[in-house]
Regions:
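N-terminal type II signal-anchor transmembrane helix
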Residues: 2-63, 128, 385
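Secondary-structure transition motifs
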Residues: 2-13, 65-66, 82, 87-200, ...
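Short extracytoplasmic
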Residues: 58-86
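Short, proline-centered helix/strand-breaking motifs
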Residues: 59, 252-257
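Outer-membrane beta-barrel proteins
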Residues: 108-112, 231, 279-283, 355-357, ...
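Transmembrane beta-barrel strands of outer-membrane/channel proteins
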Residues: 123, 248-250, 293-295, 382, ...
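Solvent-exposed beta-strand/coil patches in large extracellular/periplasmic or lumenal scaffold regions
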Residues: 142-181, 194, 199-214, 276-283, ...
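Short coil-to-beta-strand
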Residues: 241-251, 291, 378-380
Length: 444
């Protein structure tokens, strides 16, 4: 008679033991889940009011500021119970009300309790004030955001660990007391009907904000973000671990109103129209932005000492991208019409700058990293350039003094079908230059 080998018998014994252990483990998990569910519905829900002081303490630890809860009730309908909190107040360092939330709804489950989270948080009709004083100090709901608060990281981790966080019909006030360049501080701005959703499944973060600005600003706009981070990351709120894209959709916007609050190099602009923009983020750092714009009555100053550029209309795609040691800017199908009736035919442009590596330079105050700008490498590609239009607007765009004088004196006409240029150093005085292209109908 054939007998099973000892090794074979050992294998089957181990397999049977493991199977039995896994079965008992599965049963134990279901039993624990059932006990947690019963404890939730039979112990916590009926006595939720007794947990209010303890809940205030735990929430205060997470938020990093004192939190007071006026009232808390629980409703057990179906598998997942819901909790309602009223008159939730966050206090500042002086004990004053920094933020008041009239009504908060929270749904929990046994699984979320084991993770110290909730299934969903819904906040209705909150009102938030954001202020920047004359010294640049930023406060949100009366809380100083300029402080290096160690608790802020824990609060962000907790927030972005919640499966779903929803805000409906909120009100946000932005008060800026700091002068904007050469202009006085702008008037307060209020965003109404603010809706916000944050979903955080596994290692993803899905964000959406919709808000209605004042009528003079334009129409309701939408901001959306989709990010991922490593599954091994233990800090869900650490933005430096996030990689993804932000999308902005403005159905109608008045650039002149934005210029009162956001100003670049002390310059301002005007224009009414639509804009969509996509911004890419890698490990918390900006990498590129693509914007589709369609504006009318454009009036912008593009640099110090330049005349305003006035256009009847402008449309096309604008792209900015960060390189390893420089940047790249381009346009696609850019079209515009000047106030004099001249039309830009809709060509494409691409400009890139690669900066030289920085070197340590000894100074009286210590070693400083510097780079020689005369060694910077520049590349330019374009097609369908109307020389007459360029000549007309030359003193309104940042081309350099020498280029301005040359175009003004020559007043060229014609079309550059294609052009490619490569140079090193400053455009006014390059140390090396190569260029080639095709020009039609040139007149000087």
């Amino acid at each position: 008679m054939n007998q099973a080998k000892p090794s074979t018998l050992t294998f089957w014994k181990i397999t049977a033991a493991l199977s039995q252990a896994l079965l008992w483990l599965a049963v134990a998990c279901w039993v624990m889940f059932g006990l947690a569910w019963m404890a939730l519905h039979w112990v916590i829900v009926p006595r939720i009011g007794e947990f209010r002081p303890r809940l205030e303490i735990e929430v205060s630890k997470v938020a990093g500021v004192p939190v007071r809860i006026g009232e808390i009730t629980a409703t057990s309908v179906g598998i997942i119970p819901s909790f309602e909190l009223k008159n939730v107040v966050l206090l500042d360092e002086a004990g004053r009300e920094a933020l008041k939330l009239p009504r908060i709804l929270a749904a929990v489950s046994p699984a979320s309790l084991l993770q110290l989270s909730v299934e969903q948080i819904l906040i209705e009709a909150p009102e938030l004030a954001i202020r920047r004083d004359v010294n640049g100090k930023l406060t949100v709901a009366g809380l100083d955001m300029s402080k290096d608060d160690r608790n802020s990281g824990g609060a962000a981790d907790w927030f972005f660990s919640q499966p779903e966080f929803v805000v409906r019909n909120g009100l946000v006030h932005w008060v800026d007391e700091m002068p904007n360049g050469t202009l006085a501080a702008p008037p307060p701005l209020t965003l109404s009907q603010v809706d916000f959703v944050s979903r955080n499944p596994l290692n993803k973060h899905e964000l959406r904000l919709d808000a209605t600005p004042p009528a003079v600003w334009g129409e309701r706009f939408s901001l959306r973000g989709l990010f991922v981070q490593s599954l091994l990351s233990t800090n869900k709120g650490k933005f430096k671990d996030w990689t993804g894209e932000v999308f902005a959709d403005f159905a109608k916007i008045d650039v002149s109103e934005i210029s009162r609050y956001v100003q670049l190099n002390g310059q301002s602009g005007k224009g009414v129209g639509t804009m969509k923009a996509w911004t890419s983020i890698t490990k918390g750092n900006w990498t590129s932005t693509t914007a589709d714009v369609s504006l009318a009555q454009v009036d912008a100053t593009l640099g110090k000492g330049l005349q305003p550029l006035a256009l009847q209309s402008m449309s096309g795609r604008l792209v900015g991208r960060k390189l390893n040691q420089g940047f790249e800017a381009s346009t696609q199908n850019l079209q515009f019409q000047t106030q004099d009736g001249l039309r830009w035919p809709g060509g494409n442009l691409l400009y890139s700058q690669t900066n030289p590596s920085q070197k340590l330079t000894k100074t009286p105050t210590g070693d400083v990293e510097t780079a020689d700008p005369t060694q910077a490498i520049h590349d330019f590609k374009a097609d369908k350039l109307d020389l007459a239009v360029i000549s007309l607007i030359a003193n309104k765009i940042p081309l350099g003094a020498a280029t301005h004088e040359l175009l003004t004196s020559l007043a060229p006409q014609g079309t550059v079908e294609t052009i490619t240029a490569h140079w090193r150093g400053y455009l006014d005085a390059p140390t090396a230059l190569t260029a080639k292209g095709l020009i039609k109908g040139v007149q000087i």
